[in-house]
Structures are given as structure tokens and as C-alpha cells.
């Protein structure tokens, strides 16, 4: 249930801040940076995440809808109001997440939806324990 509240708080925060964005056309990188900032604000008491890579759409024909697709990775820093993830090193073996969503801008309404799921292709590495194959004497 706490996870649902966290997502809801992040979405409401994104919608509120998205309304404050000026009417100029935003670059893809700016939208991704804002999405990551709000995602991290929902991580209170948890490690911050930093951008690994962003995949812009092939073309941004639409001025009103920008699809988002980027990967983030856990850092060694814990969330505080003044901490910037860009100043934090990636955590060795840290969790990676794939984020997808959209930034939508219509006349008076601006909203950003975002979902970040664990990257199943990158399972955490655990130390391997080897045991002797035969009986021990």
C-alpha cells in the first residue's frame, strides 16, 4: 500500500510542477531531468537514482505529447532536499530501473506520467559459493 501512495504522491507532484513549466517548447533532456527529479523526491529515506541513458523518440512531431523512455541506476547517496544525484557515484551492483511514461501538454493542463520498474535483465550479482563435489573426510 505504501508503494501505491508513493506513486500517487509522485504523480500529483509531477502534475503540479508541470503546470508551472513555461509555455516554450521543452527539450527532451529537460523533461527527463524533471521526471527524474520528481521520481527521486518520492524516494525519501531511500537511495537516489541517477540517469544512465535516455532514448529520445525518433521524432518529436507532437508539441503536446512527449513519450519518455530512460534508464536510471541507484547511487550511494540517500535522499535529502539539497542533494543532487549528479554529484553521487553509482552504487556498485546498484539496482537499475527502466522508466517509461509521457509528458503531455495541452492548453492549461500539463501532466507527466512515469513508471519505473526494475530492469529484469540486470539482476543483482550475488557472490557465488562453491562446495566440494564429493564427500569430505
Curated annotation (Swiss-Prot):
Gene3D superfamilies from the entry?
Answer: 3.10.450.10
Q: Which domain of life is it from?
A: Eukaryota
- Keywords per UniProt: Antibiotic, Antimicrobial, Disulfide bond, Secreted, Signal
Q: Residue span of the signal peptide, if any?
A: 1-20
**Alphabetized PROSITE patterns for the sequence:** CATHELICIDINS_1 (PS00946), CATHELICIDINS_2 (PS00947)
Question: GO CC terms for this protein?
Answer: extracellular space
UniProt cross-references to Pfam families, sorted A to Z? Cathelicidins (PF00666)
Q: In which tissues is it expressed?
A: Large granules of neutrophils.
Q: Does the keyword Cytoplasm apply?
A: no
Q: Which GO terms describe its biological process?
A: defense response to bacterium
Cite the GO molecular-function annotations of the record: cysteine-type endopeptidase inhibitor activity
The places in or outside the cell where this protein is found are: Secreted
Name the cystine pairs.
77-88, 99-116
Q: Does the keyword Disulfide bond apply?
A: yes
Similarity field: Belongs to the cathelicidin family.
Purpose: Binds to bacterial lipopolysaccharides (LPS), potentiates strongly the early antibacterial effects of BPI. Inhibits the late lethal action of BPI.
**Name of the protein described by the UniProt record:** 15 kDa protein A
Amino acid at each position: 500500500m505504501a508503494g501505491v501512495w508513493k506513486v500517487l504522491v509522485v504523480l500529483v507532484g509531477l502534475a503540479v510542477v508541470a503546470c508551472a513549466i513555461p509555455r516554450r517548447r521543452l527539450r527532451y533532456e529537460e523533461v527527463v531531468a524533471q521526471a527524474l527529479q520528481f521520481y527521486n523526491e518520492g524516494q525519501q529515506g531511500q537511495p537516489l537514482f541517477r540517469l544512465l541513458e535516455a532514448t529520445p523518440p525518433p521524432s518529436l512531431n507532437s508539441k503536446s505529447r512527449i513519450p519518455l523512455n530512460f534508464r536510471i541506476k541507484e547511487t550511494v547517496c540517500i535522499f535529502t532536499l539539497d542533494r543532487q544525484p549528479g554529484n553521487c557515484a553509482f552504487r556498485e551492483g546498484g539496482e537499475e530501473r527502466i522508466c517509461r511514461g509521457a509528458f503531455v501538454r495541452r492548453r492549461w493542463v500539463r501532466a507527466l506520467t512515469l513508471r519505473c520498474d526494475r530492469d529484469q535483465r540486470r539482476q543483482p550479482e550475488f557472490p557465488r559459493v562453491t562446495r566440494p563435489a564429493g564427500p569430505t573426510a
